[in-house]
């Protein structure tokens, strides 16, 4: 049995319709997602929000098959990453820990402990760091370690972000190129990078580096792409009445249409796997927005999923952070 492990950290998603409301409750009960000035109100408010949002969310998940594919894709990424590490001569176990649904991070840590892992790489499947994504998972892991003194025997090696890694940037460029080449006139297509938004206060007040890292990602991808296409960056998936990072994706689509754009490639920039935000929000909702605005050639670049360039780069990242040699 390997004594070295990798823990892939991700959001999680409901596997079936019955999971939607409890998944939403777990999401909104996290103070890094919804900040409530009175902490005792966090869970009651999470119950209310999840109950009110569940019917619409179920409908959205129904439109993509009834549930989220994120668990299956992340498990597949774990298997392919393990093979990529083995191909480099390394016996490393790969685990999956989701923040808001099964397999929960707590479940993964129990398995890691039972397997006798001594060195553990924490690899968030979020290229850009945010308080609300990687930060929330790291905080949870700190709490788990604090509750169980025996876990202190496990050395934790944390990867905070990896948005500028050449392999990741190349893989993103491959996906954009694949998407562009499906158009009749690839050079005339406007590329719209759509990233998950965060509340504006996270950046302005708390110093969250997410916006800066996302903007740098887009710049690096466009440099790697080497195409003449015009491009924009916008933010999606906002929740609640507070201001989130702007511009919002739907507003940007309408503005581009007003400027005469008729061919648009939407590129999910902070999502490395297909899930509700790519398959439903971009693929269905934003397509409808685009067509209503007069953009009739709207397409979406695929998420990275198990793209070989991407998985190979994850393997190299693990090796570099462990400080070991591979063949």
From Swiss-Prot:
Report residues binding Fe cation: 196, 277
Catalyzed chemical reaction(s)? heme b + 2 H(+) = protoporphyrin IX + Fe(2+)
This protein's pathway:
Porphyrin-containing compound metabolism; protoheme biosynthesis; protoheme from protoporphyrin-IX: step 1/1
Its cellular-component GO annotations read: cytoplasm
An annotated Gene Ontology molecular function: ferrochelatase activity
The family database entries (InterPro entries) matched by this protein are listed as: Ferrochelatase, Ferrochelatase_AS, Ferrochelatase_C, Ferrochelatase_N
State the Pfam families in the record: Ferrochelatase
Cellular location of this protein? Cytoplasm
Q: Name one GO biological process term.
A: heme biosynthetic process
> What does this protein do, in the record's words?
Catalyzes the ferrous insertion into protoporphyrin IX.
Mind telling me what this protein is named?
Answer: Ferrochelatase
């Amino acid at each position: 049995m390997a004594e070295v492990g990798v823990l892939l950290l991700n959001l999680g998603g409901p596997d079936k319709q019955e999971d939607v409301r409890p998944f939403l409750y777990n999401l909104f009960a996290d103070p890094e997602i919804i900040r409530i000035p009175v902490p005792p109100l966090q869970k009651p408010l999470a119950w209310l929000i999840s109950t009110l949002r569940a019917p619409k969310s179920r409908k959205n998940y129904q439109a993509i098959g009834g549930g989220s594919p994120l668990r299956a894709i992340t498990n597949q990424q774990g298997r392919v990453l393990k093979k990529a590490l083995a191909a480099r001569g390394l016996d490393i176990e790969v685990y999956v820990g989701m923040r808001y649904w099964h397999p929960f991070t707590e479940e993964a840590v129990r398995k890691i402990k039972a397997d006798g892992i001594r060195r553990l790489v924490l690899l968030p499947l979020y290229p850009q760091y945010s308080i609300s994504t990687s930060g929330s998972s790291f905080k949870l892991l700190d709490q788990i370690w604090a509750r169980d003194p025996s876990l202190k025997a496990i050395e934790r090696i944390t990867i905070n972000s990896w948005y500028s890694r050449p392999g990741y940037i190349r893989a993103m460029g491959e996906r954009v190129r694949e998407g562009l080449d499906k158009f009749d006139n690839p050079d005339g297509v406007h590329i719209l990078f759509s990233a998950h938004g965060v509340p504006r206060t996270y950046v302005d007040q708390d110093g969250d580096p997410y916006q800066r890292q996302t903007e740098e990602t887009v710049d690096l991808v466009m440099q790697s792409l080497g195409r003449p296409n015009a491009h924009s960056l916008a933010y999606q998936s906002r929740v609640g009445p507070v201001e989130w990072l702007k511009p919002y994706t739907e507003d940007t689509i309408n503005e581009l249409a007003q400027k005469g754009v008729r061919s648009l490639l939407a590129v999910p920039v902070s999502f490395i796997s297909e899930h509700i935000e790519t398959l439903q929000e971009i693929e269905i909702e934003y397509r409808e927005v685009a067509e209503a605005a007069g953009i009739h050639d709207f397409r979406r670049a695929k998420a990275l999923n198990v793209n070989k360039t991407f998985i190979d780069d994850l393997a190299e990242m693990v090796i570099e952070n462990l400080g070991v040699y591979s063949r």
